[in-house]
């Protein structure tokens, strides 16, 4: 009986830990990815559900996250400090557009799609984009 209780307790702990981390996502800010692309986020197009949290983790000191546009009613946080981890919980469905301030012209941008709502796709397409970010933004929006 004690062995059964022990295994049930271990299973319960594993289930609780798995559930607690199920809504947490991590995106790395990279100087170079495994494919050789420079100045990129580990995920450039990320899909999450309402209430999920994403944490951006810098792999060097020169990266950050600056929010450029999002859906109506969404409160966009201030840009993060270079080299600092930042998290955001997404409460409003739609498309969110962000970039790395120092490397935006090199195409270091990303999109987060919350839920299945892409109704603000046109507004995101009209948002500011510089250098290589213009082509990448168009390509990412084309995937939606």
Task: Explain the meaning of each model-derived region.
Residues 7-16:
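Bacterial N-terminal signal peptides
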């Amino acid at each position: 009986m004690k062995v059964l209780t022990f295994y049930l307790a271990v299973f319960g702990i594993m289930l609780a830990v798995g559930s607690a981390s199920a809504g947490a996502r991590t995106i790395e800010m990279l100087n170079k990815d495994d494919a050789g692309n420079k100045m990129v986020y580990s995920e450039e197009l990320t899909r999450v559900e309402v209430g999920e949290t994403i944490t951006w983790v810098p792999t060097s000191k020169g990266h950050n996250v600056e929010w450029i546009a999002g859906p109506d009613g969404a409160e966009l946080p201030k840009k993060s400090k270079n080299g600092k981890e930042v998290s955001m919980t997404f409460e409003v469905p739609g498309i969110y557009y962000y970039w790395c301030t120092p490397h935006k012209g090199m195409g270091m941008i990303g999109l987060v799609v919350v839920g299945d709502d892409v109704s603000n796709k046109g507004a995101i397409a009209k948002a500011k984009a510089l250098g290589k970010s213009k082509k990448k933004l168009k390509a990412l929006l084309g995937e939606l």
